[in-house]
Protein backbone atom coordinates (compact mmCIF):
# COMPACT_ATOMS: atom_id res chain seq x y z
CA UNK A 1 0.00 0.00 0.00
CA UNK A 2 1.31 3.43 -0.92
CA UNK A 3 0.77 6.15 1.69
CA UNK A 4 1.15 9.90 1.20
CA UNK A 5 3.20 11.10 4.18
CA UNK A 6 2.52 14.73 5.08
CA UNK A 7 5.19 17.38 5.47
CA UNK A 8 4.93 21.06 6.37
CA UNK A 9 6.15 24.11 4.48
CA UNK A 10 9.14 23.92 2.17
CA UNK A 11 9.06 20.12 2.27
CA UNK A 12 10.23 20.01 5.89
CA UNK A 13 8.98 17.61 8.51
CA UNK A 14 6.41 19.10 10.88
CA UNK A 15 7.07 19.86 14.52
CA UNK A 16 4.66 17.90 16.73
CA UNK A 17 3.74 20.90 18.88
CA UNK A 18 3.44 23.45 16.07
CA UNK A 19 1.58 21.75 13.24
CA UNK A 20 -1.95 23.06 12.60
CA UNK A 21 -4.30 20.11 12.91
CA UNK A 22 -7.42 21.95 11.74
CA UNK A 23 -7.49 20.12 8.39
CA UNK A 24 -6.39 16.75 9.78
CA UNK A 25 -9.90 15.39 10.30
CA UNK A 26 -9.53 11.88 8.93
CA UNK A 27 -8.22 8.51 10.06
CA UNK A 28 -4.76 7.20 9.46
CA UNK A 29 -1.37 6.53 10.97
CA UNK A 30 1.31 8.85 12.31
CA UNK A 31 4.91 8.74 13.45
CA UNK A 32 6.62 10.88 16.09
CA UNK A 33 10.42 10.93 16.17
CA UNK A 34 13.40 13.02 17.11
CA UNK A 35 16.42 13.85 15.03
CA UNK A 36 19.69 13.16 16.72
CA UNK A 37 22.65 15.39 17.03
CA UNK A 38 25.88 15.51 18.92
CA UNK A 39 24.12 15.09 22.26
CA UNK A 40 21.25 12.70 21.48
CA UNK A 41 20.43 9.71 19.31
CA UNK A 42 17.81 9.81 16.56
CA UNK A 43 14.87 7.56 17.13
CA UNK A 44 11.23 6.84 16.46
CA UNK A 45 9.30 7.46 19.66
CA UNK A 46 5.77 6.47 18.70
CA UNK A 47 3.62 5.00 15.95
CA UNK A 48 -0.05 5.88 16.32
CA UNK A 49 -3.27 5.17 14.49
CA UNK A 50 -6.91 6.18 14.54
CA UNK A 51 -8.67 9.51 14.17
CA UNK A 52 -5.57 11.59 13.59
CA UNK A 53 -6.47 14.95 15.10
CA UNK A 54 -7.56 13.43 18.41
CA UNK A 55 -4.68 10.96 18.62
CA UNK A 56 -2.05 13.62 17.86
CA UNK A 57 -3.60 16.02 20.40
CA UNK A 58 -3.41 13.23 23.00
CA UNK A 59 0.30 12.80 22.22
CA UNK A 60 0.91 16.52 22.63
CA UNK A 61 -0.59 16.35 26.13
CA UNK A 62 1.46 13.36 27.27
CA UNK A 63 4.63 14.20 29.25
CA UNK A 64 6.69 11.75 27.18
CA UNK A 65 6.26 14.03 24.17
CA UNK A 66 7.06 17.38 25.83
CA UNK A 67 10.27 18.02 23.82
CA UNK A 68 9.49 20.95 21.48
CA UNK A 69 11.80 19.56 18.78
CA UNK A 70 9.88 16.34 18.15
CA UNK A 71 8.92 15.73 14.53
CA UNK A 72 5.65 14.42 13.14
CA UNK A 73 4.30 13.00 9.93
CA UNK A 74 0.98 11.36 9.18
CA UNK A 75 -0.81 9.62 6.35
CA UNK A 76 -4.45 8.95 5.57
CA UNK A 77 -5.61 5.33 5.60
CA UNK A 78 -8.93 5.17 3.78
CA UNK A 79 -10.35 1.98 5.24
CA UNK A 80 -10.72 1.42 8.99
CA UNK A 81 -10.07 -2.29 8.46
CA UNK A 82 -6.52 -1.43 7.26
CA UNK A 83 -5.46 0.73 10.24
CA UNK A 84 -4.22 -2.07 12.49
CA UNK A 85 -2.34 -3.91 9.75
CA UNK A 86 -0.61 -0.73 8.52
CA UNK A 87 0.28 0.25 12.10
CA UNK A 88 1.59 -3.28 12.74
CA UNK A 89 3.93 -2.99 9.75
CA UNK A 90 5.18 0.44 10.81
CA UNK A 91 5.72 -0.81 14.35
CA UNK A 92 7.76 -3.79 13.08
CA UNK A 93 9.89 -1.69 10.73
CA UNK A 94 10.38 1.50 12.77
CA UNK A 95 10.66 -0.05 16.25
CA UNK A 96 9.27 2.87 18.28
CA UNK A 97 10.31 3.33 21.88
CA UNK A 98 6.66 3.65 23.02
CA UNK A 99 3.42 2.45 21.56
CA UNK A 100 1.03 -0.41 21.24
CA UNK A 101 2.09 -3.59 19.52
CA UNK A 102 -0.68 -4.80 17.21
CA UNK A 103 -0.21 -8.57 17.59
CA UNK A 104 -3.50 -9.72 16.08
CA UNK A 105 -3.10 -7.83 12.80
CA UNK A 106 -1.30 -9.25 9.79
CA UNK A 107 1.15 -6.48 8.77
CA UNK A 108 0.47 -4.72 5.48
CA UNK A 109 3.60 -3.33 3.81
CA UNK A 110 3.62 0.41 3.16
CA UNK A 111 6.21 2.95 2.11
CA UNK A 112 8.05 4.29 5.14
CA UNK A 113 7.78 7.96 6.05
CA UNK A 114 11.48 8.77 6.15
CA UNK A 115 11.76 7.74 2.50
CA UNK A 116 9.02 10.21 1.50
Regions found by a protein language model. Give the residues of each.
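A broadly used, surface-exposed interaction patch
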Residues: 54-73
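Generic secondary-structure transition motif, activating predominantly at the C-termini of alpha-helices
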Residues: 60-64, 91-94, 98
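GIY-YIG nuclease catalytic motif and its immediate N-terminal context
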Residues: 1-58, 78-92, 110-116
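Coupling/hinge elements of helicase-like and P-loop NTPase modules
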Residues: 96-109
Amino acid sequence: MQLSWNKCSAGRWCLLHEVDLAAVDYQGVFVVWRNGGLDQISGVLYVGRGTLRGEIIDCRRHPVFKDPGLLLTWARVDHTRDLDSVAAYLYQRLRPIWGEVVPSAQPTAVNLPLTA
